[in-house]
Structures are given as structure tokens and as C-alpha cells.
Amino acid sequence: MDCSLVRTLVHRYCAGEENWVDSRTIYVGHREPPPGAEAYIPQRYPDNRIVSSKYTFWNFIPKNLFEQFRRVANFYFLIIFLVQLIIDTPTSPVTSGLPLFFVITVTAIKQGYEDWLRHKADNAMNQCPVHFIQHGKLVRKQSRKLRVGDIVMVKEDETFPCDLIFLSSNRGDGTCHVTTASLDGESSHKTHYAVQDTKGFHTEEDIGGLHATIECEQPQPDLYKFVGRINVYSDLNDPVVRPLGSENLLLRGATLKNTEKIFGVAIYTGMETKMALNYQSKSQKRSAVEKSMNAFLIVYLCILISKALINTVLKYMWQSEPFRDEPWYNQKTESERQRNLFLKAFTDFLAFMVLFNYIIPVSMYVTVEMQKFLGSYFITWDEDMFDEETGEGPLVNTSDLNEELGQVEYIFTDKTGTLTENNMEFKECCIEGHVYVPHVICNGQVLPESSGIDMIDSSPSVNGREREELFFRALCLCHTVQVKDDDSVDGPRKSPDGGKSCVYISSSPDEVALVEGVQRLGFTYLRLKDNYMEILNRENHIERFELLEILSFDSVRRRMSVIVKSATGEIYLFCKGADSSIFPRVIEGKVDQIRARVERNAVEGLRTLCVAYKRLIQEEYEGICKLLQAAKVALQDREKKLAEAYEQIEKDLTLLGATAVEDRLQEKAADTIEALQKAGIKVWVLTGDKMETAAATCYACKLFRRNTQLLELTTKRIEEQSLHDVLFELSKTVLRHSGSLTRDNLSGLSADMQDYGLIIDGAALSLIMKPREDGSSGNYRELFLEICRSCSAVLCCRMAPLQKAQIVKLIKFSKEHPITLAIGDGANDVSMILEAHVGIGVIGKEGRQAARNSDYAIPKFKHLKKMLLVHGHFYYIRISELVQYFFYKNVCFIFPQFLYQFFCGFSQQTLYDTAYLTLYNISFTSLPILLYSLMEQHVGIDVLKRDPTLYRDVAKNALLRWRVFIYWTLLGLFDALVFFFGAYFVFENTTVTSNGQIFGNWTFGTLVFTVMVFTVTLKLALDTHYWTWINHFVIWGSLLFYVVFSLLWGGVIWPFLNYQRMYYVFIQMLSSGPAWLAIVLLVTISLLPDVLKKVLCRQLWPTATERVQTKSQCLSVEQSTIFMLSQTSSSLSF
């Protein structure tokens, strides 16, 4: 065996620094490496077919049935249906089988149609033509036939067919522009960079002769992360190793823009592409309503088992006497007498289970799903939540949490881009204590933008002038801003000046503002060409700097750096970042003066950044290059190694100055927060900004008020006192004024709570969350939570993304288990959005990662007010009524059946006809509650927006508490007693018909069923406050349908029925005067307690919502009276 092959296998399967199991090797163009390299081992990867469908023609039926019967309710009814088939039961298998068949069939048709559409889309994608290089020539084939290692050519406006490593383009600088709108919703153009050693290959022959291998990580779904390296082989020399990152990766689904063509090598194909891996849905979130519904279901299941058990025991007690067990007309056979008693009892128990199984509402699950699915469209159709400026409307990524929007107790919000506009404007810069402002009014005149002015000392020293220019050069060079000459380019952009057509583009609005601001002060960034950055200085001379390295920004370091080389050969490292990140790394500069200015600007709500630098000698730079290269080419723990390298490089800096950028508060952000607080919701701001800046924003948006007493839990205070002492001191402060915490205080819904505000920073939070050797961490957390519960607002500053999620999780799993909502607009907010019960993304300027990973997305923060106070309120009211109503009407349905067993010797005789058993939940009572759960508005939309306190009436799952559930259950039992015994007393009078005949068993059951259908439907009509023609049509139409169906079902001889026990029954019942009287009287008696309860509660213990309803009705009557009087006076005047 070849030694190189053995060496490769040993490296691959033995442990070492690089874990080869977690990486793959790809041979570019399927070409074997030159002699001396590692042996060529062909590897098997999936083809490029995308399969987003779940089913095939062969497995649809078994797989779909398996998935549907995994649901507990469907499986339960399947068992009931099988019991009906196996043993002799009182009801036909049709009564359970038909509703189950209907539910399963409707769901299967819906899922099958959706899967058919996915098949069509997959086929269209898999069969689209793709150009690839084979033996130096351009060949065309279908996308599905692409393999890993193929070299592909993509033209402008074409979509990348798989995940590609960018090798070259027609551009001389080896760049290309892409849009990823179909992946993450971002329409801005992103720049990607070709591999340095392949960007000169512009023809098919050149690229076809490339000898290279790529080593990269195994497929993973993160769109913004990629780790790999490329080995480019030459004929004589050792391979050149270059790192590969996300900037070199072109993702499937992205589109090539403003570039004629590119060449790339396929590394991930088919279902291993990042787009395909992102098909997987997020973890399922369950709402409080769903949890309550499952708890109620368990209660009713226990009631069902109890009923069956009681009836089984009573049956055998009743039949203990021989003449009852074997009446003369129903003698048992010998085999029946010899059957095992326990087997007979178990069979009877199952028969009673079948008889009473309708107490579990199978159709409730279908109705709830339809209500959530259809209800989500009301959010997306809401014109009030459409933002004309961005052209965006609300998005619903999941409809399972609509009602959870009405239960929120804590809101965790990001600051930048969520509360603020993320539209940055450069305000000033401070250089060694000298302040420069672009727009200044001097002697009544506005100075030219390019001049600027030193607000403290207009004539700094010669050395100061050098530092000033170095500071401006640092701002011109330390960024990732691009300059485009095409005005049609999308994305955040700024024109350098009004007379030029070029635009600045960056994923960070801060960088655009800084580059634009320094341009007004005399230094203009021109472009990046052939790895040289060009700037125009104050003397209108172009300066060129070679870009050697970029140390990219990340939210943990909170800074970025560049290493550049000037035309004179001097090498500089320029670094900019947060003051907390820069100051500890500074050894020289006027730190105290700049720190004072930074703190002053922060208090005014401005965003601040500090700028520092250091000169590097050639030997230092070469050492940095080796350090960075080793970290960049690592396949395992690359991010960790890069972070360690950055720590070693970004130190011993000289402080140059600081900048101040204004980020204005969003429109109506303050009004929204004020309304949310009135609704009893606690609002926390979680931000990475410094404390002073964030606090100023909190005051501006009315989170903190002038009379709010601020409590600080920051690193600075903890340095002066121990963490234990600080926590106990704050705890005593808040408890001294607020007293013992009540249950409402804990939930954040007390209006009388002392107005405290807490400020905590990331370092202090780390100390609180950090486990201690003595196990005291838990005590610290409890103390911290106790303090937070007593504060009306909390500000968490200097937060890393994972710390935001930690805060949300801490509150989410506290002992009160409040419902949490997280809202943000950037990638650093995704972790807390996924952690919260409800995650909302703001469709902002920092991309769409937050919107993609959220449950809902809105254009602006102000739309959160209507999302919660209106939509959330309505959906909670609607679905709560739906759940309670379903259980109520099924108690009404099945309890008379239970009572009937005491009058038929526990013989399992059914009270209702098979057709009524089957259609009760499917047809007779289903549509009214569905329309109610979609249309009901117990108060007007304007009232809910105007009076946020109404939100408190439905907080903490108020309408699905056990007290309310028991009331609905008892109401159902009372109505069932009225139905049964009212009809029973009517039947005691034998003169119920004109000819003296008495009613039979089926007429008795039909009378009970008729009263029941009318009662439960009219009960819903009484609960309806918002009437439309659709409600009228469905409610009265359902009653009419029942009457017409009963007339046809009993008035026609149906040939497919073996026996027709309902023939002429309904018509005979309607021919009886007492039956008509009984229906009217029993319906009235059944509805009376609920009506009296509502009237008394409204008068004696009205809720805020009921007071508003009463006031609205009075105003409506008053306005109608005034209108009638005005009309009368008008007619009399003539």
C-alpha cells in the first residue's frame, strides 16, 4: 500500500490536534493533488437534490397516519373506535369513526396538498440548468447532478446552485456582490472575496488547471459561520495554505449582483447546504392556554373513567337479583352464563367508556388549530401595523402563540435599533481633550462642514495637530465601509457629500456615520482598490495605505482593529471600540480628559467609541502575521484561537480620542413603553451600551421618570463593597418602602408599587450568576430577583448576547413563572428571542436575523402596543372562550347520557340517535364558536389602545383559572340536569300528543338533544358582543340547519339504513304543543343562571372591562336617543 495513503488514514482516524472526523477534504475539480501530496481518497457526498417534501407517493398514507396518531387525542379516539369494532358496544362504530375519519382526512388532504406544492418547487429547483467546468471546458447540466468538488460558473442575477467557495470573478480585485434576501431577508448587497491565490483565474482553461484541496468543517446551519482552509499546489513548491471564512463562502439561494460572472467550487450540496439545514424548525414553544387545555383534558379523562367505573359497579349491583339479570324476554345463553365475571365486567367498563367518550372533544383540537392559523392573518392584514417608510408589515412566523401575546408580564427589549432608530448622526469627536463639531454656528453663521471647529482650543500644538490628523486617518481606515458608485444599491448608505454620486455602504450604521462625520471635518475615505485604502486629506492630496490585516469586530471584544502600511513604510495598528474595551489596553494618552468627555456624552444619550493606535516595527508585524495565520487556518476552535491572538495584539495602545454619535429615539417609543407599564407589564432594557448612554435613553423613553429612585448594581459599586453587602443593602432599601411583597407585586402588576429603577451591568451579572464554592450563588440569585420584582423598570447595560438570554431565562424560570417577551432587531438579540416565551423581531437596519428567528416580526417598536394590547388581548379572550365552551357543551351533551343509565337499568342504551352523536361536534355546534373565536371584540379596538389597564383583566391566565373552569363545568352540569329532568317531567304527562299517544325513547332523546342544541348556541349568542352579518348567518344558520336536517333525517326513508328508528320522530315531536312549550321553557331556564350571574357580577363586582362595556352601551343609547330626537325635531320644523 502507498505510504502516503497509510499516513492519510492514520491522520484521519487517530486523535490529534485536528479532529478529522469533524472536517472534510474536497478535491477541487476532482483533480488528484500533484505527486508528494497526500494520497487521493475519493469520498462520497450527497448529490445536489433538494428535498423539502416530507412524503413520497409510496409512504404518504402510512407516514401521515403515524404522525397524526402520535397526537394523544387522535390516538385516544382510535382506541375507542377499535373497542367499538371488537366488542358489542351501545353505539355504532360510525359515531366515533366518522368524526375521527373527518379530522384525519381533512388534515391529510391539507398536508398532502402542501407537500405536493413542495414537490413541485423541489423539481423546478433540481432541474434548473447549471454551468460547470469539465476538462477546461464549459458544460451544462441539471442542478441535481452537481457533485462536491465541481467547479461552477454563475452569471449575474443567477442564484448559486449550492454552497460554493469563491475562487475568482471577472473583477480585478477578486470580489463579487450578492444578495441573501431569500435566506435571511436582507436586501443589501454583501461583498465576498475570492481566494487570494486563485482570484487571477478568469478563463475556463485557467480555472480548469487549478490543483487545490479544501479542508473545511462538516455542514452546520449557521449562515454566518464557516471555518476552512485551502491548499493551493504548484508544480515545485509546497502548497500555499490560505484560511477560508464566511467572506469566501457563497450560499445556495443567494443571488449574484453587479458582477458579470464568478467561478466557485462546490463544497456542500443538496441537503447539506446551509439553506437546506435551515429548513428545520425552531424548538416548539407551548402557550399557557395549551398547558391549561391539556390540564383540563386530564380532568375530563378522569371524569370519563369515573363515570364508566361507577356505571359498571352499579350495573352489577342492580343485576344482583336474578329477575333483573335475566328478564323473561332477554334470557342468556349457556356460553354467556359461563363467561368469566371479571372479563364481563371489563367488557362492560369499555362499553361505558365508549358510551361516554364524547366528553373528550376531538373536534376542539381541529378548531383550535384553525382558529390560530386563520387568526394569524388578522395580524398580517393589520394596516395600522404597516410602516410606509420601510414598506414592511408584520410577519407571523408561528401562529401557536397568538393568545400568549395577551399574557405577557415581562418585556425584555434591546435599545439600539429597537427603541432607537439606528439612524446614526455624527455629533462630535474629542481628540486629546479638544472637541471638534461638524455643524457649528459662529457669530450667527453656520461654518462650512469641512472646516469643523475646536470647541475648547482652536490652536492645538504641533504634536496635537499630528495626533488630530492621525485620529482622522484612523476613522477613515478602521472600518469595513464600502464605497459604491451605483445609486441603485440597496442597504444602509450615506452620500459622502451632496456633489458626489458615490454612496457609503456598511452593515453597521455607526461606521457609516463616523466615515461621513470625519469627511465633514476634512478627511474623506475614497475607496479600497487592490488591497489599498485611499483617503483624501485636508490638502486634497490622496493618501494610500496598504491594508495588511483586519481584526474583525465581535460582540465579546466590543472592538475592531486594522493594520495598515503607509506610503512611507510605517505600519500602524488602529483600534476602535467601546470605552470599557479600549481604556484597559491603553498605556499612553490623555485618558482622564477623554474619559470625562465620554461620560458627559453618554449622559446626554450619545453613543461613544474610543480610538487608539500603536506603531509596529517590521519584526512585530511579522510575529503578528504568524500568530494570526496559525489561528486563521485552524479548523478546530478557530474563534477561540483568534480571540486569544487578538488579546495579544490589541494591547499597549496609545489613546487618540473618542467619538459621539446620536441615535434618535423611535417615534412613539416613549408612548408605547408608558402604555405597556400601565398595562401592568414590566419593561427591562438589555443593551451593550455603556450605563450613562443607556440611562439617558431610558429617561427619554419614559422607562425611568424624574421621580424614579435609581439603584445601581454595577462593577464599580461592587469594587467598593462586597457583592453580598450590596445586594442586602439594595434589598433593604426596596423592602423598607414597599413592605412585604404580595402576589401582585411579584407578578409586576401592582400599581401602588414604589417607583424604583435598577441598573446592572454585565460584569455584576456574571458575579451573581457565577457558582460559588460554598454554594451561595442561589442565594445571590434570589436576592437579585427579589430586588428586581420590587422595581418598576430595570436597565441591564454592557450585556453580551448570552447574558441577555441568561437574564430572560432567570426570570422565565423564577418561582412565579411569568410569561416573558423578548424584542430586538440584531443578531445579538437572537439568543434572548429564542429563550423567551414569545420572541419578536424588529425588521431593522442590522439585518433580518432577529426577524427570522422570532415568533413574530414588526416594523417598528411602536407596533408592539397594538400587538399586545389589542391583538394579544382579543386572541386570549377568544381562545379562552373557545376552550371553556367546548368542554361546557360536551358536558351538556354527555351528562344526560349518564343520567339516562339510571332509567334503563345500566344497559348502555344510548339516549341520542347515531346521526346526532356523530354530527353534534362536527356540524351542529362547530361553526358558531369558530366564528366567535375569530371575530369577537368584547370592547372596541380604540378603547383597548386608549385604556391599557384593561390588559390586566386577562393577565395571569385569568379566564382559564381553575375557578373559571369549575364554573363552566358546573354550568354544564346544571344545564344537563335541566335538559334531562325537564324533558322527563314533560313525559310524565301522557297527553303530550293530540291523539293521546305517549312519546317513546327516541322522541325523549330528540327533545333533550333539541333543547341542548338551542341552549348551547344561544349561550354563545349571549356571550357575543361584536355582531356582524357573518355571526348572524352562522348562529341562526346552524340552528336552521339542525331543524332542516332533523326533518329530512326522520321524514325520508333512507335505503342505505338497515333500520330507521328516527323515522317520523322529529315531526311527531314538533306536532306536540307541550313539546314546543318544553323547548322554550327549558332553554330559558338553562340560560337564566348565566344571565343572572352576569347581571349581578356586573353590578356588584364589575371588572374594568365590564365598566367600559357598560359605559359604551350607555353612550350608544344616549347617541341613538339624541339622533332620534334631532330627526324628530327636523321633521317637525317642516
Swiss-Prot record:
The chain crosses the membrane at residues 62-82, 89-110, 297-318, 350-372, 882-902, 915-934, 965-986, 1001-1023, 1030-1050, 1069-1093. Mg(2+) binds at D414, T416, D825, D829. The active site is at D414. Keywords: ATP-binding, Cell membrane, Deafness, Disease variant, Endoplasmic reticulum, Endosome, Leukodystrophy, Lipid transport, Magnesium, Membrane, Metal-binding, Neuropathy, Non-syndromic deafness, Nucleotide-binding, Phosphoprotein, Translocase, Transmembrane, Transmembrane helix, Transport. InterPro entries: ATPase_P-typ_cyto_dom_N, ATPase_P-typ_P_site, ATPase_P-typ_TM_dom_sf, ATPase_P-typ_transduc_dom_A_sf, HAD-like_sf, HAD_sf, P-type_ATPase_IV, P-type_ATPase_N. ATP binds at D414, K415, T416, E511, F553, K576, R607, T687, G688, D689, R798, K804, N828, D829. CDD domains: P-type_ATPase_APLT_Dnf-like (cd02073). The flippase activity is inactivated by caspase-mediated cleavage in apoptotic cells, allowing for PS exposure on the cell surface and engulfment of apoptotic cells by macrophages. The ATPase activity is up-regulated by aminophospholipids PS and PE and down-regulated by increasing intracellular Ca2+ levels. GO terms for molecular function: ATP binding; ATP hydrolysis activity; ATPase-coupled intramembrane lipid transporter activity; magnesium ion binding; phosphatidylethanolamine flippase activity; phosphatidylserine flippase activity; phosphatidylserine floppase activity. Its cofactor is Mg(2+). Proteolytically cleaved by CASP3. It catalyses: ATP + H2O + phospholipidSide 1 = ADP + phosphate + phospholipidSide 2; a 1,2-diacyl-sn-glycero-3-phospho-L-serine(out) + ATP + H2O = a 1,2-diacyl-sn-glycero-3-phospho-L-serine(in) + ADP + phosphate + H(+); a 1,2-diacyl-sn-glycero-3-phosphoethanolamine(out) + ATP + H2O = a 1,2-diacyl-sn-glycero-3-phosphoethanolamine(in) + ADP + phosphate + H(+). The modification Phosphoserine is found at S738. Pfam families: Cation_ATPase, E1-E2_ATPase, Hydrolase, PhoLip_ATPase_C, PhoLip_ATPase_N. Widely expressed. Expressed in myoblasts. The record marks D457, S458, D490, G491 as: Cleavage. It is a multi-pass membrane protein. The keyword Metal-binding applies. One of its GO terms (biological process) is phospholipid translocation. Its EC number is 7.6.2.1. Residues 1-61, 111-296, 373-881, 935-964, 1024-1029, 1094-1134 are cytoplasmic. Overexpression of ATP11A confers resistance to lonafarnib. Catalytic component of a P4-ATPase flippase complex which catalyzes the hydrolysis of ATP coupled to the transport of aminophospholipids, phosphatidylserines (PS) and phosphatidylethanolamines (PE), from the outer to the inner leaflet of the plasma membrane. Does not show flippase activity toward phosphatidylcholine (PC). Contributes to the maintenance of membrane lipid asymmetry with a specific role in morphogenesis of muscle cells. Belongs to the cation transport ATPase (P-type) (TC 3.A.3) family. Type IV subfamily. It is linked to Deafness, autosomal dominant, 84: A form of non-syndromic, sensorineural hearing loss. Sensorineural hearing loss results from damage to the neural receptors of the inner ear, the nerve pathways to the brain, or the area of the brain that receives sound information. DFNA84 is characterized by slowly progressive, postlingual hearing loss. Leukodystrophy, hypomyelinating, 24: An autosomal dominant disorder characterized by global developmental delay apparent in infancy, impaired intellectual development, and loss of developmental milestones and ambulation. Brain imaging shows non-progressive severe cerebral atrophy, ventriculomegaly, hypomyelinating leukodystrophy, and thinning of the corpus callosum. This is Phospholipid-transporting ATPase IH.
